[in-house]
């Protein structure tokens, strides 16, 4: 066995660090996840809430770890350990990881002004807008939060957690320092605070936005949830806090914190607040208000929507004031900030020849957040005599108690509600939907259940009137859908763009060699070809956009990324077909279906006219051809005949679900394609 040594819980960790530095290289990093470390790094193994990293020591060694630092609970446990690389045990390491990581990275937060924001809703908007305001003034600022990590030079890295694990936190802060950051704005989640992910971080300024129901699957009670949030305000070294005194928790904090405090309020009753906003005016393009600090006031014209976002801006104003900004400087910066990705984000249509509804994507996934967003959009919709649509679901393996509450909020404030899926994770989507509809009035005519989220989005975008507003709530910036232990590409904004482009009635084409100018190219992958290789060619041919699995930013062509494009084509064809209340005849069979389809097409043409009936052309009768045919449907069509072919089991069921025929004709069933019927 290689070198092994146990450090008692009362031993200074500096001795461990010195021993490690003598073993590993100067660029070695600490990692708590064996999957992320690189050769020469140090694996820090502690038990977690669900798993235990100590069971992955061998995986870390196989990945090239140079040393192991292990949480140890007893001497006997340590005596049973062995490894082929240097290993160090630390009693109660789990409670000292923050201290260890801080020392390893040479106290990065001591050289930074770290600003942390906590609260149920608004954390992401606050830290992003704080960073935007600071960048306007040329301040080198980094961000850590739900949207990932952004360094002062603009480089970004994805993040799995709102608040990264404690080792990743200190490693990231060290990288921020190395890249020249002066200020780091971070989101402090309740779970992150409860699990000590900010341990060892020197936080200078902390802010509280609000508290409402969320994460009770983890905290179990609102009291425990609140207590986790309040841990942020017990950090040693705090120099100032910013509090929302429209929230009872903010009022409580204002009475107990012992550092300089700035309070903010939107309520007219809260005359004692340090910062307030008056004369709010919101339209589809933004919100104007008067920002006041007691007797001093400045006007602010912003691009953000809603009173709840004005409250978030007040929080940002409080933090900027604590950083030494004048009120006028704050107001000027607010005019230059832009909406945060996935937070009341308007999806701008690629084309606008035909008027389209206003589509908004928002991360609202709690009853309170959904209500705030819907109230904002409801007012805008009412001002133009339009309807408000709400497409939403609830996440699996999360607080089930909020599902019915969100259903009730949606039905109360939206004119049309589409209940769907939102990261079902390990739960059955139908079971989650069943929980949601408990909160809906029975027999509600304004509610549609569509479990498939892509279909739900397409239905709302395609069915809404041009003056309407369509809210896609719950996923916001997320570019995935998580189900059954897998994450697949899924972006609400991209599916909304697909619906908006369909409304323009562009031709959807898959052959780059024959593409018409003004068409939308759908890139397919086959055994011997990849349509994504021809994006530059179709751009030169005049394509207005391309539907792709993943955007290629090197090509100067607008792209709509929908993941698997074959599956997306079926989705688009199905959704578009649903927009037409006309008779459709489906023809299938082993032999004679094309001849039968042509005879029916001739009869239909004689009945309603050639241009008023749609029929399958050529051999477009499979999982590619059928949706492409359905996407040719136009308002002038009165009837259609669609040929359905099959060369593998289950294909007819798929095509029938897409076509949704009123009349089905099966010619015969013979022994065809036996090589595929297995």
Short names for language-model regions:
Residues 48-50, 190-191, 213-214, 247-248, ...:
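Short glycine-rich anion-binding loops that position phosphate/pyrophosphate groups of nucleotides
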